[in-house]
A protein has these predicted regions:
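Surface-exposed or secretory-pathway low-complexity segments enriched in glycine-proline
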Residues: 1-20, 73-118, 173-208
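Acidic, turn/loop-rich segments in luminal/extracellular domains of secretory-pathway
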Residues: 2-52, 100-152, 204-208
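Extracellular interdomain linkers/hinges and stalk-like, low-complexity segments
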Residues: 27-33, 37-89, 127, 131-133, ...
């Protein structure tokens, strides 16, 4: 509790104690005195104790739909959307989020300021988890943790069949067929060599 924070107050005209909204969790005491109207010096004092608890905070695990690692997704999910404070969706202005355990690959990240989970293009396929914690700003010790599980799939790769005919076997020929045209990775042409997006291996060579 800090100076200037709301605190419970006793109305001496009614004897009722009120607790303002946004009062930090704590045990508060108010000492009051009652005096006889007929004999104003005939008085006694007592203490009223008011226990104020923090609002329930719940961070819920998230498992968004799988994402293509080749293309990524800058806003896969907002991890805070299903988290609640006092039974209502959290307002990021009312909580502070921190990363407890980051993903094993930094390409999969959670922005604590916004709750947004992103997957960068070129992320290897795998299942990545991020453990995060949200704490109420009003009561910084009022916290809960949750886990985001992001499944990253390999890119969509397509190799089309190819054919060529009429090759003179006696003279032969180099480069009689380029098999790459029509092959794609994530909808883009497959390319080899330095800066290429695929590699090529011979699975079954031609046989006599």
């Amino acid at each position: 509790v800090n100076i200037g924070d709301p605190v419970p107050a006793l109305d001496p005209l009614t004897g009722l104690i009120s607790v303002p909204a946004n009062t930090p969790a704590s045990n508060y005491t108010i000492t009051y005195e009652i005096c006889e109207t007929l004999n104003p010096t005939n008085c006694d004092q007592a203490i009223a104790t008011i226990g104020v608890i923090a609002a329930p905070i719940v961070a819920v695990d998230d498992a968004p739909a799988a994402v293509n690692g080749g293309t990524g997704n800058p806003s896969l999910i907002n991890a805070c959307t299903n988290d609640t404070l006092n039974g209502s969706p959290v307002n990021v202005a009312d909580i502070t989020a921190t990363i407890v355990t980051p993903a094993s690959n930094p390409n999969v990240a959670l922005d604590p300021a916004t709750g947004t989970v992103s997957v960068a293009p070129g992320t290897p396929a795998g299942t990545y988890t991020i453990t995060y914690e949200i704490c109420e700003n009003l009561n910084p010790a009022n916290c809960d943790q949750a886990i985001v599980t992001a499944v990253v799939n390999a890119g969509t790769i397509v190799a089309d069949d190819d054919s060529v005919s009429g090759i003179n076997g006696t003279s032969g020929g180099a480069g009689v067929l380029d098999v790459l045209p029509g092959d794609t990775l994530n909808g883009n042409p497959a390319t080899l060599g330095g800066g290429g997006n695929v590699t090529m291996n011979v699975v079954t060579p031609a046989a006599p």
